[in-house]
From Swiss-Prot:
Species of provenance: Dictyostelium discoideum (Social amoeba)
Localisation per UniProt entry: Cytoplasm; Nucleus
A Pfam family the protein falls into: Proteasome_A_N
GO cellular component, one term: proteasome core complex, alpha-subunit complex
PANTHER family for this protein: PROTEASOME SUBUNIT ALPHA/BETA (PTHR11599)
Organism ancestry: Eukaryota, Amoebozoa, Evosea, Eumycetozoa, Dictyostelia
Similarity section: Belongs to the peptidase T1A family.
InterPro entries found in the cross-reference section: Ntn_hydrolases_N, Proteasome_alpha, Proteasome_alpha-type, Proteasome_alpha1, Proteasome_asu_N, Proteasome_sua/b
Known partners and oligomeric status: The 26S proteasome consists of a 20S proteasome core and two 19S regulatory subunits. The 20S proteasome core is composed of 28 subunits that are arranged in four stacked rings, resulting in a barrel-shaped structure. The two end rings are each formed by seven alpha subunits, and the two central rings are each formed by seven beta subunits. The catalytic chamber with the active sites is on the inside of the barrel.
Sorted UniProt keywords: Cytoplasm, Nucleus, Proteasome
Keyword Nucleus: yes
Full protein name: Proteasome subunit alpha type-1
Function recorded in the entry: The proteasome is a multicatalytic proteinase complex which is characterized by its ability to cleave peptides with Arg, Phe, Tyr, Leu, and Glu adjacent to the leaving group at neutral or slightly basic pH. The proteasome has an ATP-dependent proteolytic activity.
């Protein structure tokens, strides 16, 4: 009843206490490509499913390096994500210049969440239509955070966002207790398994072209693994499938 009256203004609440533009931005995140994040004591891993606009087009980049100790996976509008990524890079660079040390991951996430929030309150702006999964490592250990267009952010042991992310969450909820002691290779394998759950068609599979992996941890600067470099992890996933079938 009230939706048409209030869904074009970011500064006005509807009578039911909702801001529809924020809900639309959240929907953009839900419709984006799936991304999974998980961590152990020493490492944090991002795994993302890349999409291609057509058979003639290349796959869109979904994981970005922010600094040596932190990176992001995105779901939603890539252009908005690029703006936020540049903002995060500038914040890390400025902090490093002033303090000659790396910014703590939580502080960086708080800053980008505040930037999200400004666009939910000021007239003439729209919310960023993108959700971020932030993976980082600092003196406090490995971290996984999720940011939302609403300006909220959350700390997780493991999480997934994007299209059909609930299937990946179900896998993560069943196995997250074992993640803490996992090696980097095992953590990546769990991430790929969770991401595989988001693929609806049995004819589609994870391959080196549509998968992107980001890793960071103790003694490991943030690194993106794609194309041929990702194939060994996909091979490991395929080799473990018959074992799963036998144990079931």
């Amino acid at each position: 009843m009230y939706r048409n009256q209030y869904d074009s203004d970011i500064t006005t609440f509807s009578p039911s206490g909702r801001i529809h533009q924020i809900e639309y931005a959240m929907e953009a995140v839900k419709q984006g490509g799936a991304a999974v994040a998980l961590k152990s004591k020493q490492f944090a891993v991002l795994v993302s499913l890349k999409r291609s606009s057509s058979e003639l087009g290349s796959y869109q980049k979904k994981i970005f390096v922010v600094d040596d100790h932190v990176g992001i996976a995105i779901s939603g509008l890539t252009a908005d994500a690029r703006m936020l990524c540049n903002y995060m890079r500038n914040e890390c660079s400025n902090y490093n210049y002033v303090y000659e040390s790396q910014m703590r991951v939580e502080r960086l996430v708080t800053k980008v969440a505040d930037k999200h929030q400004v666009h939910t309150q000021r007239y003439g702006r729209r919310p960023y239509g993108v959700g971020l999964l932030v993976a980082g490592y600092d003196q406090l250990g490995a971290h996984i955070y999720q940011t939302c267009p609403s300006g909220n952010f959350y700390d997780y042991k493991s999480i997934s966002i994007g299209s059909r992310s609930q299937s990946a969450k179900t896998y993560l909820e069943k196995h997250f207790e074992s993640f803490e002691e996992c090696t980097l290779e095992q953590l990546i394998t769990h991430g790929l398994r969770a991401l595989r759950e988001t693929i609806p068609n049995t004819d589609d599979t994870l391959n080196s072209k549509n998968v992107s992996i980001g890793i960071v941890g103790e003694g490991q600067p943030f690194k993106i693994i794609e194309e041929a470099d990702a194939q060994p992890y996909l091979n490991l996933l395929e080799n473990e499938e018959p074992v799963e079938m036998q144990t079931n």
